[in-house]
Amino acid sequence: MEYGKYYLIIRKIAQLVFPKYKAPQFEPTDKPVVYVSHHQNMFGPVNVLLWYPTFRRLWGLSVFIDQQACYDHYVNYTFTQRFKLPPFIAKPLAWGVSYFVSRLAQSARVIPVYRRSRQIIRTLKESVETLQAGASVLIFPDIDYASDDSEVGRIYEGFLNLEKYYNRKTGEHIDFVPLYAKQTTKEILYGQTIRFDKDRDFIDQRDEKAHELQAELNRLANTEVEVDLV
């Protein structure tokens, strides 16, 4: 699998506008991984997707993949509640933006995330299939995704259930790799790989691993040096 032409064209145009970030020229391991990054009010997704050279599949809310659902989300929340636009402006704006965003998400091969729904199993299944096919997955688990703070606050832990599902399917464990777009140095940095302990129950270490990922991302936020990977 690879990015679609529409996404690649839009990305190439955007690269002419946005400041360039230096990305790693090698992968942290020879197998597919789950990259965990900091959202920072779209700063993280924009720069990682713009400047990271290799294919990876982003977790994104399911509403952004379907045009009608995307339109409803922009009209009922983003433009009216978050940006306080009046409906007569929000509706035509949402119509145009929803077509652009949904097509871009489809072309980028975004994995739909179904929050607060039993359909989340579809997200896990598609993610595991992606990893088994040799492609990596990219997740931005910030609870307060609208925060502009360079440091990571609380993160959702649900995405770590990928470990349990993947292990059940393959007998192997996932490498969770922190990935951070650093504004001050215009670099994309790897952190230390986080792995679950095969000799401990998953549920006993899920909270611990979430905190380790959060701490490693914040270490990257406050350092100028990329670490060695293990």
Residue ranges and their predicted role:
Residues 1-3:
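Short glycine- and acidic-rich boundary segments immediately preceding or forming the N-terminal edge
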Residues 5-32:
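A short, well-structured juxtamembrane/interface segment
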Residues 16, 107-108, 133-134:
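Structured helix-beta-strand junction loops
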Residues 19-24, 44-45, 124-125:
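A generic local structural motif
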Residues 26-31, 52, 130-133:
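Flexible, charged surface loops at secondary-structure boundaries
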Residues 31-115:
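Catalytic core of membrane glycerolipid acyltransferases/transacylases, capturing the structured
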Residues 115-230:
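Non-catalytic C-terminal accessory region of glycerolipid acyltransferases
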